[in-house]
Amino acid sequence: MPAEMKSAASGSDPRSSGERDKALNLVLGQIERNFGKGSIMRLGDASRMRVETISTGALTLDLALGGGYPKGRVVEIYGPESSGKTTLTLHAIAEVQKRGGVAAFVDAEHALDPVYAASLGVDVENLLVSQPDTGEMALEIVDQLVRSAAVDIVVIDSVAALTPRAEIEGEMGDLAVGSQARLMSQAMRKITGNIGKSGCTVIFLNQLRLKIGVTYGNPETTTGGNALKFYASVRLDIRRIQTLKKGTEEFGIRAKVKVAKNKVAPPFRIAEFDILFGRGISTLGCLLDLAEETGVVIRKGAWYSYEGDNIGQGRDNTITWMEENPEAAITIEQLVRQKLTEGSEVKANSMKPLAAAARTAAAAAPKATADEAAA
């Protein structure tokens, strides 16, 4: 059998390996000349193999997400009213600003409270804020901010408030079926590529609606059509599960977040944390929950103990002790991260889904977090 027929029968290319490499390098060079450097590359040549993240401000949620909000991706946070959606994004903005980053808030609902934002650690003096008149204006502003590659995080509050220009200019009662969905679909096609290139994290807040005529299954859906669901790398479903009280006085809520979609880490994890009125996410509360689950802090009855010494009776008193002893809290955080890196089992129902993602999350989280806190 001739050599050519043998090659064809075996399915191999008759050209030598050197010729194939030369042809490949030639076409790669041609593509880069036509479309710019970085338009095509080997995955192993990429400068960042692991997706960088932004802390959410809640250690339990960071673990559930595999480190935090991914950079250069679209994130959607949805849930009922007063469930903590805006609080989550303000904490993310504060974390970005702590590291010298630039943040923008597109306030389509015209409801941003600068006093509350400042109480959560947001540098309101340097926060970029836009209150657009139309949905088109809002999304065009987002696109220009992303294209600049000078902004680290952009928050849009909310998709439901992105009203198309035609609807605003029309009369009350005029039908505009599907106009917002078309607007979002066009915008996502346009800005998603730029988001990836710039490394900017774009977070959309969204509201819930009920589908009519659903007898079986979940009747809830989000506004703005299906485009955002597809383009988002992370989707978070946040719910208020408990109201926190001291006597008859309400001072916060217990929130539960389900990772409904995650393209950069295992999905369907669940995290719980406290949101205190006027103060935001209780970071020490998150730390205490994980410290108890990993065995760093032991609870017997109502008493919590650390290294054999009782540190507080009841959860609130223990958190107060941690506030008064910041060095001990830093040490506890270091021990918790070490335990999670080693793959410690997490026993409580609220934390079970985090155990399997612990190693991934600890590896993706910034290694200097505890050291920076100590400094």
Swiss-Prot record:
Q: Name one GO biological process term.
A: DNA recombination
Q: What species is this protein from?
A: Parasynechococcus marenigrum (strain WH8102)
**Principal place where this protein is found?**
cytoplasm
Q: Known HAMAP family for this protein?
A: RecA (MF_00268)
Q: Which SUPFAM superfamilies match?
A: P-loop containing nucleoside triphosphate hydrolases (SSF52540), RecA protein, C-terminal domain (SSF54752)
Per the UniProt entry, the disulfide pairs are: none
Gene behind the chain: recA
Alphabetized InterPro entries for the sequence: AAA+_ATPase (IPR003593), DNA_recomb/repair_RecA (IPR013765), DNA_recomb/repair_RecA_CS (IPR020584), P-loop_NTPase (IPR027417), RecA-like_C (IPR049261), RecA-like_N (IPR049428), RecA_ATP-bd (IPR020588), RecA_C_sf (IPR023400)
Q: Name one GO cellular component term.
A: cytosol
Q: Which UniProt keywords apply?
A: ATP-binding, Cytoplasm, DNA damage, DNA recombination, DNA repair, DNA-binding, Nucleotide-binding, SOS response
Q: Which PANTHER family match?
A: MITOCHONDRIAL DNA REPAIR PROTEIN RECA HOMOLOG-RELATED, RECA
So what family is this one in? Belongs to the RecA family.
**Record's subcellular location:** Cytoplasm
Instruction: List positions binding ATP.
Output: G79, P80, E81, S82, S83, G84, K85, T86
Q: What does this protein do?
A: Can catalyze the hydrolysis of ATP in the presence of single-stranded DNA, the ATP-dependent uptake of single-stranded DNA by duplex DNA, and the ATP-dependent hybridization of homologous single-stranded DNAs. It interacts with LexA causing its activation and leading to its autocatalytic cleavage.
Please give the Gene Ontology molecular function terms for this protein.
ATP binding; ATP hydrolysis activity; ATP-dependent DNA damage sensor activity; damaged DNA binding; single-stranded DNA binding
Protein name stated in the entry: Protein RecA
Disordered: where is this region?
1-20
User: The organism sits in which domain of life?
Assistant: Bacteria
